[in-house]
């Protein structure tokens, strides 16, 4: 079972919302090469992730892992908090 678990997608991103109970919104930024011009183009995608203990806050860098559907929009769960946000 651990081999199949390692095949799940793992993304690293930044928490942009933690207003829902046990749910965070994570924006994952990545790059693609433009087909014609070859320039790297940055694009981002938002994912909702399950945060069981409400430990992630806005601005944190987190890792999320693909899991079974937990709700209509949640398909990921919080794996770990890589870096806490600096609160000024």
UniProtKB/Swiss-Prot annotation:
InterPro entries: NA-bd_OB-fold, Ribosomal_uS17, Ribosomal_uS17_bact/chlr, Ribosomal_uS17_CS. Disulfide bonds: none annotated. GO terms for molecular function: rRNA binding; structural constituent of ribosome. Keywords: Ribonucleoprotein, Ribosomal protein, RNA-binding, rRNA-binding. One of its GO terms (cellular component) is cytosolic small ribosomal subunit. GO terms for biological process: translation. It holds the Pfam family Ribosomal_S17. It comes from the Bacteria. Part of the 30S ribosomal subunit. PANTHER family: 40S RIBOSOMAL PROTEIN S11 FAMILY MEMBER, SMALL RIBOSOMAL SUBUNIT PROTEIN US17M. One of the primary rRNA binding proteins, it binds specifically to the 5'-end of 16S ribosomal RNA. Belongs to the universal ribosomal protein uS17 family. This is Small ribosomal subunit protein uS17. It comes from Ligilactobacillus salivarius (strain UCC118) (Lactobacillus salivarius).
């Amino acid at each position: 079972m651990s081999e199949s678990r390692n095949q799940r997608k793992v993304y690293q991103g930044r928490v942009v919302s933690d207003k829902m109970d046990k749910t965070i919104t994570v924006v994952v930024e990545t790059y693609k090469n433009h087909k014609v011009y070859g320039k790297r183009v940055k694009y981002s995608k938002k994912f909702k992730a399950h945060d069981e203990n409400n430990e992630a806050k806005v601005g944190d860098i987190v890792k999320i892992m693909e899991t079974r559907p937990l709700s209509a929009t949640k398909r990921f769960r919080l794996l770990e908090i890589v870096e806490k946000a600096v609160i000024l």
